[in-house]
């Protein structure tokens, strides 16, 4: 079956019990992952950046004024009460542990921690953020999952690397008890990809074919349902409690310009786009 086609998104609300009005204006989405866990995702409002980065751009690699980015990051840290640790994301499969001594800029696309003084943080503007709370809230993790990292090579991507690297989820029982939240990302109506993207998934798992629909614009291209592909990978790895993004329009970054940054939407017009942060930390 083809992926669900987005309708026009209603930017005034987001669906599901896993999200709600955040207590701080910087957050567009909050994730309910347990009483000892704080987690959520920023939107584009609440910062000081101008132009295509207006206003809460948290990416320091997209051409925005460095002072504005620093001010935005300071606002986020103040809202959290802990330090967000920013990775240098490379669309790869590297997972690193972090603590209060970890500097920003470590090259990786996922991180985990047991330290309650830092927040696992990933930056996104169409790619999916995935936040994980391990059993007992003893450890948390954040993953940046674009199609390259999700697909990986020969079916071994960023989620497989997380399972192999993060001690809290190495056992099947722990994965069954872990809660995962998928944040906002580009929806299936807007994520047009080439045949090589489809092949990267279908070559490893033939049943992923129904997460792709032919593009009505180009017969040689496809519309990919990235949230569905992420959920399938998670279930194959034994994660059962998966909340958040279900691929419907109200979770789509590309269709909600007042709420979210979108690289695909904005870069073709402005030459750049801001970045949002998905964060998770232990109380």
Residues covered by each model-derived region:
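Active-site microenvironment for binding and transforming phosphate-containing groups
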Residues: 1-283
């Amino acid at each position: 079956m083809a992926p669900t086609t987005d309708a026009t998104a209603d930017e005034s609300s987001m669906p599901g019990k896993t999200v709600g009005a955040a207590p701080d204006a910087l957050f567009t989405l909050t994730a309910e992952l347990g009483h000892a866990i704080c987690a959520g995702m920023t939107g584009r409002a609440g910062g000081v950046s101008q132009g295509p980065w207006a206003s809460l751009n948290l990416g320091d690699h997209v051409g925005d004024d460095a002072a504005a980015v620093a001010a935005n990051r300071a606002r986020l840290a103040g809202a959290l009460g802990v330090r967000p640790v920013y990775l240098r994301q490379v669309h790869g499969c590297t997972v690193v542990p972090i603590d209060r001594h970890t500097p920003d800029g470590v090259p990786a696309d996922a991180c985990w921690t047991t330290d309650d003084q830092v927040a696992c943080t990933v930056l996104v503007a169409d790619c999916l953020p995935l936040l994980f709370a391990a059993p007992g809230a003893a450890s948390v993790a954040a993953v940046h999952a674009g199609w390259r990292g999700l697909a990986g090579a020969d079916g071994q991507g960023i989620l497989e690397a997380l399972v192999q690297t993060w001690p809290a989820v190495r056992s099947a029982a722990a994965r069954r008890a872990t809660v995962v939240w998928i944040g906002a990302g580009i929806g299936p109506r807007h994520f047009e990809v080439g045949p090589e993207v489809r092949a990267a998934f279908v070559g490893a798992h033939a049943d992923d074919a129904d997460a792709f629909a032919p593009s009505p614009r180009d017969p040689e291209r496809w519309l990919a349902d990235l949230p569905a592909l992420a959920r399938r990978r998670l279930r194959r790895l034994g994660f059962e409690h998966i909340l958040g993004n279900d691929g419907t329009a109200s979770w789509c970054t590309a269709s909600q310009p007042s709420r979210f940054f979108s690289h695909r939407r904005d870069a073709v017009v402005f030459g750049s786009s801001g970045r949002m942060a998905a964060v998770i930390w232990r109380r």
